Amino acid sequence: MKILRKICSVVLCAAVAVFMACSLAEGKEKAGALSAEDFVPADTVAVSDIIEGLTARSAVVTEMTTGRVLFEKEPQEQCECGHYAKLMVLLLTAEKIDSGELSMSDTSVVSEYANSQQGSQIWLDKGEKISVEELIKSVSAGNANDGCAALAEKVAGSADKAVELMNSRAKMLGMNGTVYTDCTGMEEGNVTTANDTALLCSELAKYKNLTPYLTCWLDTVRDGKAELVNLNRLVRTYKGVTGMKAWGSEKAGSCIAATAEKGDMSVCVVLNGCDSQEDMNTEAKKLLNLAFDTYEIYTPELPEDMVKEIVVCGGEELSVELAPEGLYPIVIPRGTYRMVECDFTAEEKLDAPVKNGETAGEIRYTMGGEVILEGKIVACKEVKKMNFICGIKKLVYNLLSM
């Protein structure tokens, strides 16, 4: 508790002063998959103070909806991938289900490759038929290697093709420190980083249909023949947890990727190389609490006097409506939203032709005099330049309206 109080004190005192340097890039759109560029390094926070007492060799704490890195320790250090690889298999599965190419009720015929898997397993027999849903359960809660192999083969057509898709998807997400050599993550050569795992979790967290499986504590598959026990103890000990995966090995130590929601915030904690499972769980809870207690989501509010319409000169219409663009929720130190100020600038007029989305002004949000978010004020639709025929029509209309 002394360590936690010290950490909270340091963070709360420093958060307002240092927050602005971590503001998100200008004009970045909120929609779409988060990439490596979306994660802003926590380089302005005294990391050594924040991570004091952690046994983890590497760690990352992010707010997933904004991509803001809150705390980090050696985030790019490569480590054994292990069961984290199964999160990528789950992501590929979720995307196939979302596109309609796969359903929970579809069945997979267990191959010799899947049957040959060692370690954590649900004891699948060669030629056995098992549903996609049961395979998802076995991978989400049970870390089953045979279940993962069978699921990967169902999704990609073969284990080799699955590895190709896994590496391709990792590249798309900006997981530059990750390499998959097999679909289960158990072979030599599978590597990842804490930062990459946070990127993967942020993408996987979008698929809410998987949450019941990722948060399941105990379950069975194969008509009760195989019992599943989730190594992520936070699914039953931390309120608001939404997944993801815990595992360990002699070489890697105890590792966890845990996600949780509280209010508007969705936080991911990744800890690699903890000294023990007990340390891993304690430190994950500590960092989740620290994130929720220290930060909050701020949704930009528009000033009441913001210009909503602008005159168009020489256009088929006399004016065009305006709207803000490029504004999205951001992370700020908790309790500082009253310090946020907003101002805007706008042109007096636009000359036709006006393009849809044409810039007519700027809007910015500041805290303590520093810009934390910037956007544009743009035209809501196209306005064509007035021609002779249009001019005659308007003249006649105005005469008839007199």
Each model region followed by its residue ranges:
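Gram-positive cell-envelope targeting signals
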Residues: M1-A33, F388, I392-M402
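Domain-terminus/edge residues, biased toward the C-terminal soluble/receptor-binding domains
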Residues: M175-V179, E187-M402
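A generic local structural motif
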Residues: K2, V45-V47, C255
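Hydrophobic alpha-helical segments, especially transmembrane helices
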Residues: K6-I7, L87, K262
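Active-site-adjacent loops and short helices of periplasmic peptidoglycan-processing enzymes
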Residues: A25-N195, S202-K208
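Residues in and immediately flanking transmembrane alpha helices
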Residues: V18-F19, S99, T299-L302
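Sterically constrained small-residue positions within well-ordered secondary structures
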Residues: V18, I50-E52, A260, P353-V354
